[in-house]
């Protein structure tokens, strides 16, 4: 991993219209931890609350899941996720990348079962685990597209 990436604190978002998964990761140790679900109102976050979370964790990079169809086409949800990512970048001036989130939901559900077996799933949902998986995929291949 390039040295410039090793000190990054990464925050990832699995965008949704009713709720959004959030995770935080530390690039130096390639960690990723799902956080509690964030409520959304028709795809719009409470920006004051979201910015409090950002201030608390002080990320240096944002990843926002890009919900693509299996044929690589974008959907209405893709456009809304891009809009969220652009506004997030504008509100914070933090570098923001869109990352392909296909297949993370299925993987996240499997991971959630593991959390439930360990009794750690009270506030964690598949959406937050999906955000955590976005960070893990970034560690393996740090590539994305501009919002």
From Swiss-Prot:
**Keyword GTP-binding among record annotations:** no
One Pfam family matching this protein: RuvX
Q: Which Gene3D superfamilies match?
A: YqgF/RNase H-like domain
Main location, first listed in the record: cytoplasm
A GO cellular component term found in this entry reads: cytosol
InterPro entries under this entry? RNaseH-like_sf, YqgF, YqgF/RNaseH-like_dom, YqgF/RNaseH-like_dom_sf
Gene Ontology molecular functions = nuclease activity
Q: Please provide the Gene Ontology terms (biological process) for this protein.
A: rRNA 5'-end processing
Q: For this protein, what is the EC number?
A: 3.1.-.-
Q: Where in the cell is it found?
A: Cytoplasm
Ordered alphabetically, the record's keywords are: Cytoplasm, Hydrolase, Nuclease, Ribosome biogenesis
Does the keyword Mitochondrion belong to this entry? Answer: no
The role this protein plays is: Could be a nuclease involved in processing of the 5'-end of pre-16S rRNA.
Report the family membership: Belongs to the YqgF nuclease family.
Spell out the protein name for this chain: Putative pre-16S rRNA nuclease
Q: Which organism is it from?
A: Acinetobacter baylyi (strain ATCC 33305 / BD413 / ADP1)
């Amino acid at each position: 991993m390039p040295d410039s990436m090793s000190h990054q604190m990464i925050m990832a978002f699995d965008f949704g219209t009713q709720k959004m998964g959030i995770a935080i990761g530390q690039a130096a140790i390639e960690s990723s931890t799902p956080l509690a679900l964030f409520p959304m109102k028709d795809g719009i976050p409470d920006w004051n609350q979201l910015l409090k979370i950002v201030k608390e964790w002080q990320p240096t990079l944002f990843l926002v899941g890009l919900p693509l169809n299996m044929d690589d086409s974008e959907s209405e949800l893709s456009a809304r996720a891009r809009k969220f990512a652009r506004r997030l970048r504008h509100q914070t001036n933090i570098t923001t990348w869109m990352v392909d989130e296909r297949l993370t939901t299925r993987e996240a559900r499997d991971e959630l079962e593991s959390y439930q077996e360990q009794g750690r799933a009270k506030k964690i949902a598949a959406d937050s685990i999906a955000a955590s998986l976005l960070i893990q995929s970034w560690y393996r291949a740090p590539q994305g597209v501009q919002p």
